């Protein structure tokens, strides 16, 4: 894509690294179960009144109570894969997404995504996505943009990286779990 134009568009909302985004948007500052989608970061979302009904068959309480091993529709992730995806890079890391987005099950080896439990909208564009775009497009300030967002996910700043694009891809994988934005990352 056109990296200079993408960076310019992202900066219109997020500003320079370390600065606050344009109001009314703000970055999350804590892990709150009533705000699993980091609502203050949603730039555009579609309201879906029957979302809970639609996802219950795959991630709902009845699936958990009846056991994911007894369900033909339950969608789960292995604990090993979750732990690989959210591996701590720093002992101080306390990833909000890891705390909020998984439900325990009757399985000793799997958990269920809980990102959309009691949520009534489908995110289309998030503030975090603009930070990742800015990080990807800015060779000089990419790490600073990434660290700004990491700080708002309960993660320690990275002081140096050998492959910034790979680190951005890791964060995309965590941030957009159960969403379609990962398709835009295929070019990396």
Residues of each region from the PLM?
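Acidic/polar-rich alpha-helix caps and helix-coil junctions
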Residues: 1-63, 67-72, 77, 83-186
């Amino acid at each position: 894509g056109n990296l200079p134009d993408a960076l310019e568009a992202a900066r219109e909302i997020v500003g320079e690294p370390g600065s606050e985004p344009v109001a009314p948007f703000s970055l999350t500052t804590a892990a709150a179960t009533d705000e699993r989608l980091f609502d203050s970061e949603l730039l555009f979302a579609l309201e879906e009144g029957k979302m809970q009904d639609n996802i219950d068959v795959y991630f709902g309480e009845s699936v958990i109570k009846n056991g994911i091993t007894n369900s033909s529709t339950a969608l789960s992730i292995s604990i090993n894969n979750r732990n690989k995806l959210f591996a701590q890079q720093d002992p101080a890391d306390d990833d909000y997404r890891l705390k909020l987005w998984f439900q325990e099950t009757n399985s000793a080896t799997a958990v269920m995504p809980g990102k959309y439990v009691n949520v009534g909208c489908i995110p289309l564009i998030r503030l975090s996505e603009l930070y990742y775009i800015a990080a990807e497009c800015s060779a000089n300030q990419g790490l600073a943009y990434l660290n700004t967002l990491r700080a708002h996910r309960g993660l320690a700043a990275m002081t140096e990286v050998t492959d910034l694009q790979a680190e951005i891809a890791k964060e995309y994988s965590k941030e957009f779990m159960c969403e379609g934005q990962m398709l835009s990352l295929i070019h990396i």
